[in-house]
Amino acid sequence: MFNKFNTKPLWEVSKTLSSVAQGFEPADMVIINSRLINVCTREVIENTDVAISCGRIALVGDAKHCIGESTEVIDAKGQYIAPGFLDGHIHVESSMLSVSEYARSVVPHGTVGIYMDPHEICNVLGLNGVRYMIEDGKGTPLKNMVTTPSCVPAVPGFEDTGAAVGPEDVRETMKWDEIVGLGEMMNFPGILYSTDHAHGVVGETLKASKTVTGHYSLPETGKGLNGYIASGVRCCHESTRAEDALAKMRLGMYTMFREGSAWHDLKEVSKAITGNKVDSRFAVLISDDTHPHTLLKDGHLDHIIKRAIEEGIEPLTAIQMVTINCAQCFQMDHELGSITPGKCADIVLIEDLKDVKITKVIIDGNLVAKDGVLTTSIAKYDYPENAMHSMHIRDKITPASFNIMAQNKEKVTARVIEIIPERVGTYERHIELNVKDDKVQCDPSKDVLKAVVFERHHETGKAGYGFVKGFGIKRGAMAATVAHDAHNLLVIGTNDEDMALAANTLIECGGGMVAVQDGKVLGLVPLPIAGLMSNKPLEEMAEMVEKLDSAWKEIGCDIVSPFMTMALIPLACLPELRLTNRGLVDCNKFEFVSLFVEE
């Protein structure tokens, strides 16, 4: 695969690199006195130099003969050097930051490349949204490697999205220079039941010899998992149990260990390696979804490496999991992922391996960050008008919009979605609720809130009604346009008045997240770019998110990253019960179910 993510292709500079390695020409940069973390052999090689030319590595070893008058020399002074870190699965939209601001935030932490699945913005704006994010990334040093969204909508027939992506669209995007594969194939039922659409988008990717990324959340690891992998899917980030992760690795599937803002899977899935003493070559560390306050407080892959080490994974193994393993997963290890001759000169200097403290970051042979601060400029991208005005709701939302009716009854037994804090799954519960004036009442005493999803893309007027449990809210309401994956307007709350205020607040600001109580807005994060992102800097976004978290606590919710958990309520490809703008979905059987249980 031709790498568009370096300043110059190898074939164009091969003569120069060979000459520099032999001392016939001086290097552009030489790193001296380093302790090389060799991810190819999983060892530390002392007193190693690295010569760099044309944005690539020319020599690893003694590089004194490569130094000329114009060569920039960086003395590592005994620090470790490692390949730049690669995040194998990330939705930038979940950071609420633009791509350029995201790059500014993560590069100083050693992240040199991301495999970005922009299926959030694609669900709102279609492939135009993907193009906008690609353009946004071009002004940054970060290597923005993009996978075409595979499931827009996530599960066809169960929700309304702003756009749809089919095999023909995938075929076209595989011609784009920035596309390296197919985004997570969430429609595993479509693969297992051999639908033309699911196999069509996978097939177009395989025809282009690019990587199909996966999403297999079922605990079944027998014939279903085998069939899924056999279709061409190469990796999966949805393992939450060690046995699932181990089963996938044993079948040659790159298994991505997730540690994000809300999903803390590493503690459990790391046992696949530490508890079984198996080869880790098919294991990758990823973030998936990370909020701005997490990036500001903890960092990015540097933090995830540290967490892996804390869970008992050897430091060199953890670094392999964000470098060569990831590059091999995407069939790009001939370009990325190791400090070896010919590869992209993407290098991080690490003061110590225990705390994974990054002191310098080099991308394509350029020093781009030092001591946690970006040392290069990043161009700001202005998103087009259609991206900035994405709220299209047909009917005016009032308190009456939240009525759930049950004629001539005093009580009903409702299907209720119970969330699992810090996990992506849900439980289906059957709970008795009171009816007053033919209107079903939520019951905060039982931790049961009302939930409504309004379609916001095409002014259809469709809305889905349900109940949720597990947030702990006693009084108030929350709303968000970050509601995976269709990103319709999701509102949950204890009373119709606060729910209407929450919904209308987001309509007025172009989307985002809000918490209200007693007719007052307690916390608001405006996200005007497709209702998903903002152009504001990380620090400002983190402050707003912290205030929103405080607002959540004020109204009674103390779970970790509650908006991320809330955002998965409509995601119909995850078990067990979900709510979309079309109604309640049994995600084990993939069929609509009634809100009320028949007695």
Curated annotation (Swiss-Prot):
EC number(s) for this protein?
Answer: 3.5.4.2
Keyword Glycoprotein among record annotations: no
- Say if the entry is tagged with keyword Hydrolase: yes
Instruction: Please give a single GO biological process term from the UniProt record.
Output: adenine catabolic process
Query: Which cofactor(s) are needed, names only?
Result: Mn(2+)
Q: Which residues form the signal peptide?
A: none
Which InterPro entries does UniProt cross-reference here? Adenine_deam, Adenine_deam_C, Amidohydro-rel, Metal-dep_hydrolase_composite, Metal_Hydrolase
Q: Which UniProt keywords apply?
A: Hydrolase, Manganese
Q: Which family does it belong to?
A: Belongs to the metallo-dependent hydrolases superfamily. Adenine deaminase family.
The entry's protein name is Adenine deaminase
Organism whose genome encodes this protein: Clostridium botulinum (strain Loch Maree / Type A3)
Q: Which gene encodes it?
A: ade
